[in-house]
Amino acid sequence: MGWLTRIVCLFWGVLLTARANYQNGKNNVPRLKLSYKEMLESNNVITFNGLANSSSYHTFLLDEERSRLYVGAKDHIFSFDLVNIKDFQKIVWPVSYTRRDECKWAGKDILKECANFIKVLKAYNQTHLYACGTGAFHPICTYIEIGHHPEDNIFKLENSHFENGRGKSPYDPKLLTASLLIDGELYSGTAADFMGRDFAIFRTLGHHHPIRTEQHDSRWLNDPKFISAHLISESDNPEDDKVYFFFRENAIDGEHSGKATHARIGQICKNDFGGHRSLVNKWTTFLKARLICSVPGPNGIDTHFDELQDVFLMNFKDPKNPVVYGVFTTSSNIFKGSAVCMYSMSDVRRVFLGPYAHRDGPNYQWVPYQGRVPYPRPGTCPSKTFGGFDSTKDLPDDVITFARSHPAMYNPVFPMNNRPIVIKTDVNYQFTQIVVDRVDAEDGQYDVMFIGTDVGTVLKVVSIPKETWYDLEEVLLEEMTVFREPTAISAMELSTKQQQLYIGSTAGVAQLPLHRCDIYGKACAECCLARDPYCAWDGSACSRYFPTAKRRTRRQDIRNGDPLTHCSDLHHDNHHGHSPEERIIYGVENSSTFLECSPKSQRALVYWQFQRRNEERKEEIRVDDHIIRTDQGLLLRSLQQKDSGNYLCHAVEHGFIQTLLKVTLEVIDTEHLEELLHKDDDGDGSKTKEMSNSMTPSQKVWYRDFMQLINHPNLNTMDEFCEQVWKRDRKQRRQRPGHTPGNSNKWKHLQENKKGRNRRTHEFERAPRSV
């Protein structure tokens, strides 16, 4: 019974080690890592590799009702079928030769800049889209007819109605823009000049006069990079609706020592029409606040992620209080990292109702404004809810004056839990895009994040509460490569109706399903360990989880991922595909061999056991100079007869132990190998010794070299060994007698005889092909 006790202790030790690895941040590693080839082979990705004369598939518009994805690119607008993006329509919208030549004469790149890059693509009404492009540094806009119904199959450009795109689309295709079309009015954050210096938030189209932010005032906007724009209701009264812009900009003078970038959220009232005597045709309700995304550090020194890259609003039950997800990266060139922070709109509104930023004191630093704030409070929308003013043109002069000089709030907006929910550092990529799906699971609702990177991969991450629903744990489920070549992901859309994810980049468009339950495995434990809210064990396979379906055999544990509790009553026999793979490997004595075993899950802890021939006892393999352990398996050096036996590869994850592989290693001694090599074609080994004695010198040379090669215990001297063989060969060639004209005729007949013998014995002297 002693050996049984030792095995039990060994298993408990492995379990404790596995749990320790989890506590040390093992969840930060993707459980599954799928290459582009694996995604293709498993039919989990569909790619549109773009057209030869187009690129920059960055502008997305998702239409769930028509089951279409509209994409703006270079000189083209596409309409993709949501079921399969291989089915698409296209509109060609290039610039004229005159515009292109003018752009070229202005010193711009004719291929990368002097084209019509689509920057704005919005739904205008039930039958038309509104599109704007850079127009080779001459912005232009028009309408696209899509018909009343999806079956109309209409997708064409309104060639008779082109508009000036200034204040709607940037001139430079490299500049970011954010836009929103509401009730026939276009809200845009963009640059309004050729040089890309006059940045503003505009409202154009519609029946009202265009309106914008204050010009040439860094307190309002300081070289911003616009990310996105969203309409969010403040109350049940539509007059209180506000448009929020997310952007990053240079820090205001005095706000930070040295040059720095800050992430911002800006607000404007939808019913803002500018002032009467001051701020005419300018926003009177514009306010902005800083978005903080940082990791708390010792002594109050935080690590900040200030480069806002993307924003996603998760609307659920209350449209007035969506959850804001923001993707951030670091500004430092030394420390590169990415993070996802989550914000509540109640915190945002609290900041906009807080103190204004004001410069005062001997050092003229930014301090909270302590004076009297005029009524109605600047930033409040004119409505019956919060005042009694019918229009911003009726606001008192002191309100307009205060709003003009105090556009920034003093307090920043901190993320929920005061820290990011996802952090990635020390990796070869940074986050660029994010979309989020709220999924119903057996034990609650979970937000599943799909995060795009600058190398063309998508991370699937779920936030799981630990002790409470506010203390979240980051679990990285999958890392998927969706493009053949590394390229930055610049656009993402998620279709809950089709359960598909759509991704855009410079190279093309990709489509992949939100869930791939079958890839997790064919056992209940494997499905439970995945902790994927989309998937559950249905009694026979890991399949899509539907909350409405009632099955007693359904097994799912997202919060803990504990297969020992949920799958302990299930016995997985061979027909469930749970039996380990078996292999037989032959190795040569004194040589090296490699036993390959890598689990599907990158979070699993792998350990090996060895079982000698005709023995039941198994012992754990210890790593030493003889056995080297790698992520891919075991390397056994200088094999001996005692190494023959069974090698068992086990994977431990979250307390669950699974045998992945059983390798039977047969070590062949050198004498036996010599007999095998010298057997004749008839399989008669009795002539082995006679054949060895009759070998020519050249045969013995290659045989000696071969045996020395396979028997050489030190792999590091392989180059030295080859060098010795080459030196000997060169030395033998130099020692051959030279041919002189005087004795050439004398030895001519001997040379001819030698040629004949060489022809007859050539095949015999060649090394066997099996070698």
UniProtKB/Swiss-Prot annotation:
It comes from the Eukaryota. Residues 728-771 are annotated as: Disordered. Expressed in the dorsal root ganglia. It is found in: Secreted. PROSITE patterns: IG_LIKE, SEMA. Pfam families: Ig_6 (PF18452), Sema (PF01403). Changing residue 447 to G: In HH16; phenotype consistent with Kallmann syndrome. This is Semaphorin-3A.
